[in-house]
Amino acid sequence: MGKLLIVGIGPGNYENMTIRADRALKESQVIVGYTVYVDLVKERYPEKKYITTPMTREVQRCQMALEEARTGETVAMICSGDSGVYGMAALLYELRGESREPEIEVIPG
């Protein structure tokens, strides 16, 4: 079973990203996010597999991230700002259900 990292990338540029967030994105094989946010990090991590959805597709985005993590990948779900407050943490925990798989870690931005 893989792992799902919910990563806050800060207000939008690499210089404002935390060291911990950068490390999480480097560790991940897959980066999932809203298309605009993925465009902000894609140049920095070109070797990653990217999955994007447009705005208003949050449930679909979370389901795709969970599916990737369940295949054994380390997946980063990127969010602007703080991943626990503005991000997808609550929705991902809800969609994961009681199975406790995959492991989820919240990394604030």
Residue ranges of predicted features:
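Class I S-adenosyl-L-methionine
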Residues: 1-107
